[in-house]
Curated annotation (Swiss-Prot):
Pfam families linked to this entry: Ribosomal_L29
Keywords: Ribonucleoprotein, Ribosomal protein
NCBIfam families: L29
Similarity field: Belongs to the universal ribosomal protein uL29 family.
PANTHER family for this protein: 60S RIBOSOMAL PROTEIN L35/50S RIBOSOMAL PROTEIN L29, LARGE RIBOSOMAL SUBUNIT PROTEIN UL29C
Protein name: Large ribosomal subunit protein uL29
InterPro entries: Ribosomal_protein_uL29, Ribosomal_uL29, Ribosomal_uL29_CS, Ribosomal_uL29_sf
GO biological process, any: translation
Molecular functions (GO terms): structural constituent of ribosome
SUPFAM superfamilies reported in the protein's UniProt record: Ribosomal protein L29 (L29p)
CC annotations in GO: cytosolic large ribosomal subunit
Keyword check for Secreted: no
Species per Swiss-Prot/TrEMBL record: Deinococcus geothermalis (strain DSM 11300 / CIP 105573 / AG-3a)
Amino acid sequence: MKLSDMRALSAADFDKEIAARKKELMELRFQAAMGQLAQPHRVKQLKREVAQLNTIRSEQSRAARVAAQTGESQ
């Protein structure tokens, strides 16, 4: 998923996407432990996507807090 697509997600969609990627990551780690991992690069890719989703979610919540604080002070 591209960053522009990630930024367009709603708050509920962030949680769904993160949960889906973490579940897939868990399954891939299990496959790696069993020695049956077909795409080892996918583990790195999923970890990166989870981190990007978490970063975007925190950026958006921080921006919302700042907007609320500036709105109160006016």
